[in-house]
Regions:
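Short, well-ordered beta-strand core segments
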Residues: 51, 99-100
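Short glycine-centered, acidic/aromatic-flanked micro-motifs in structured strand/loop junctions
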Residues: 27, 102-103
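C-terminal accessory "lid"/substrate-recognition subdomains
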Residues: 74-98, 104-166
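Nucleotide-state-sensitive switch-loop elements of NTP-binding domains
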Residues: 1-87
Length: 166
């Protein structure tokens, strides 16, 4: 809640002085995307064009068998009423419009499509890109369509009470 209040103050201050074409906001890796999505959905002066999630492909390889164990671990958490980093990671994947696999140079290249396939089981609408040595084409950020709130509306409705309790 305080983070959204700080963000709102910063954006209002920025809009008083400038009319930016694009604002890029980097959040903490432990930040749940839903409050940010709701903030922009209800904002009259700025729109959310993309929600990027960066996922460490080396971590997925080692901790989640290249993504294969993400859904089973999430199911287990749901059955047991447990919330941990698995929930956060899966929910970040579910809400994002673009996913960037970092450290793609640190795993076997033929494993990247496997990781992408498991990510697409969680979010079939997300475009998955791998970056090697941290190189991202910045121009791609300027070619985004508006974020599709409809795709995540039901998910947001179901998760809102859970997230508010955290």
């Amino acid at each position: 809640k305080k983070g959204i209040e700080k963000l709102d103050k910063a954006i209002q201050k920025l809009l008083l002085k400038q009319d930016p074409e694009l604002i890029i906001i980097e959040t903490s890796g432990s930040c749940h995307p839903m409050p940010l999505i709701e903030y922009f959905k209800n904002h009259s002066q700025v729109e959310l064009t993309g929600l990027f999630t960066l996922v460490d492909s080396l971590m997925l390889a080692h901790d989640y068998q290249y993504g294969e164990s993400l859904i089973p671990k999430m199911r287990n958490n749901l059955v047991n009423g447990k919330r941990d980093t698995v929930n956060l990671l899966v929910e970040q994947i579910m809400f994002c419009s673009h996913l960037i696999l970092t450290k793609g140079d640190r795993i076997e290249q033929d494993r990247l499509p496997h990781i992408a396939s498991y990510i697409n089981e969680i979010n079939p609408h997300v475009s998955v890109h791998s970056v090697l040595f941290g190189k991202l084409e910045i121009e791609s950020l300027f070619e985004l369509e508006e974020y599709d709130y409809f795709k995540v509306a039901q998910l947001a409705k179901e998760l809102k009470p859970v997230i508010e309790r955290e």
